[in-house]
């Protein structure tokens, strides 16, 4: 409720599964002109809330082309709110320029390494720091992007989706990968097309990385912040593992890596020196 009102949102797009929650908070969101449910007419919820729209009905009959207006590169592009801070969430406003620069940086080989040959599955939601930039990087690179929906917490469903869509790269928090690996371990199933996973949000256990090794999957540990669009560092040491002995490589691969292009890092001690 706070974010909707603070951002002065006029239209809110939502998954049908969130409708029970929306019915509770809608009366408190007085600035919202319309609630757009991302579904077809037959799956629309029955509700007494006014100004509810069906996404597919809104699209029906509309032109298939769109003439984009001229936009200054420094104009506002997107607004994303932090969630892990104390106090109220804080909005971070991105310009078109910063978003494009971040997109180029995330596509680089030592970052997420996204190209037109990839099928990308961002398990991290778009409200979690812009799905780590994947919704921007995929169309720029020409990669196929698979939208997982909201039922990706269990290993069997995730493994099935990876195999059905031929996913080559995926991004998510450690819990997601723990669930996937537990399923693969117990079922004997494999994810043959998966080449790399990007892990962030919290520290990735070495055991997860080493188990992914047995499936031929490169694990990349990354770090970022909402204020950084969000990617700040990426660890691509897996491509250079032949340069290290086993113990050294284990220590190196668990850190969050090096700053990506455009990021400046200042390291200080407890005395700010």
Description of each model-found segment:
Residues 1-60, 71:
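Structural core segment of the AMP-binding/adenylate-forming
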Residues 100-119, 129-168, 183:
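Conserved AMP-binding/adenylation subdomain of ANL enzymes
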Residues 33-41, 220-227, 257:
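Beta-strand->loop->alpha-helix junctions that form or flank phosphate-binding loops
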Residues 69-71, 250-259:
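Short Gly/Pro-enriched turn/cap motifs at secondary-structure boundaries
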Residues 62-74, 79-121, 133, 143, ...:
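Conserved adenylate-forming
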């Amino acid at each position: 409720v706070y974010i909707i009102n603070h951002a002065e949102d006029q239209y809110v797009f939502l998954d049908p599964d969130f409708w029970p929650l929306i019915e509770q908070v809608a009366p408190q969101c007085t600035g919202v002109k319309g609630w757009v449910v991302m579904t077809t007419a037959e799956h629309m919820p029955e509700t007494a809330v006014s100004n509810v729209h069906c996404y597919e009905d809104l699209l029906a009959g509309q032109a298939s082309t769109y003439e984009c207006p001229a936009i200054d590169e420094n104009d506002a592009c997107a607004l994303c709110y932090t969630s892990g801070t104390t106090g109220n969430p804080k909005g971070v406003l991105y310009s078109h320029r910063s978003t494009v620069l971040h997109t180029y940086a995330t596509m680089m080989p030592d970052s997420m390494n996204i190209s037109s040959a990839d099928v990308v599955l961002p398990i991290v939601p778009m409200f979690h720091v812009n799905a780590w930039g994947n919704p921007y990087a995929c169309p720029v690179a020409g990669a196929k992007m698979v939208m997982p929906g909201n039922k990706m917490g269990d290993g069997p469903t995730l493994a099935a989706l990876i195999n059905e869509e031929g996913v080559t790269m995926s991004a998510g928090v450690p819990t997601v990968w723990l669930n996937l690996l537990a399923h693969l371990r117990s079922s004997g199933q494999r994810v043959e097309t998966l080449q790399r996973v990007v892990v962030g949000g919290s520290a990735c256990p070495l055991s997860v990385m080493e188990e992914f090794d047995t499936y031929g999957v490169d694990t990349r540990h990354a770090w970022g912040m909402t204020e950084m669009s969000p990617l700040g560092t990426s660890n691509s040491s897996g491509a250079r593992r032949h340069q290290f002995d086993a113990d050294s490589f284990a220590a190196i691969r668990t850190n969050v890596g090096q700053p990506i292009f455009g990021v400046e890092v200042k390291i200080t001690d407890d005395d700010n020196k």
